[in-house]
UniProtKB/Swiss-Prot annotation:
Name of the protein: Transcriptional regulator MntR
Subunit structure: Homodimer.
UniProt-annotated location(s): Cytoplasm
InterPro entries in the record: DtxR_MntR_Metal-Reg, Fe_dep_repressor, Fe_dep_repressor_sf, HTH_DTXR, Iron_dep_repressor, WH-like_DNA-bd_sf, WH_DNA-bd_sf
NCBIfam families, per the entry: PRK11050.1 (NF008273)
Phylogenetic classification of the source organism: Bacteria, Pseudomonadati, Pseudomonadota, Gammaproteobacteria, Enterobacterales
């Protein structure tokens, strides 16, 4: 039987979840947004030290596209959290906890990026999309991405 013009097709309707699930979902998103900047900064500091031997505020500002005062404010926050040490005239260094967080963030990024590549996403888009997605997926989802990538072959 053919469908008449103007007749809507059947669509799956998303059901509104109960209030507790809704609250928990938004709480997780807020927490991911809060951690996103922290993860990005410690990962960048680690990358700069590894690639150029030092992490300077001016370099971080240039790479993040923000002002130096914005970087300085975040660095104070990271120092208060015990993730970095700022040594005058020498630069910024990660504590053991900061390096651990940078490594975890780097691994999350790589898992998401590899998954996107296996799906056929172009390398440049996969890299950019992974940068945002890595902060918003659960460990369960990361495990599924990792398993899928292993099963279907990393490109």
């Amino acid at each position: 039987m053919s469908r008449r013009a103007g007749t809507p097709t059947a669509k799956k309707v998303t059901q509104l979840v109960n209030e507790e699930e809704h609250v928990e979902g938004f709480r997780q998103v807020r927490e991911a947004h809060r951690r996103e900047l922290i993860d990005d900064y410690v990962e960048l500091i680690s990358d700069l030290i590894r690639e150029v031997g030092e992490a300077r505020q001016v370099d971080m500002a240039a790479r993040l596209g923000v002002s130096q005062p914005t970087v300085a404010k975040m660095l104070k926050r990271l120092a208060t959290m015990g993730l970095i040490e700022m040594i005058p005239w020498r630069g910024v260094f990660l504590t053991a906890e900061g390096e651990k967080l940078a490594q975890e963030s780097r691994e999350r990024h790589q898992i998401v990026e590899n998954f996107l590549l296996v799906l056929g996403v172009s390398p440049e888009i996969a890299r950019r999309d992974a940068e945002g997605m890595e902060h918003h997926v659960s460990e369960e989802t990361l495990d599924a991405f990792r398993l899928f990538t292993q099963k279907h072959g990393a490109k």
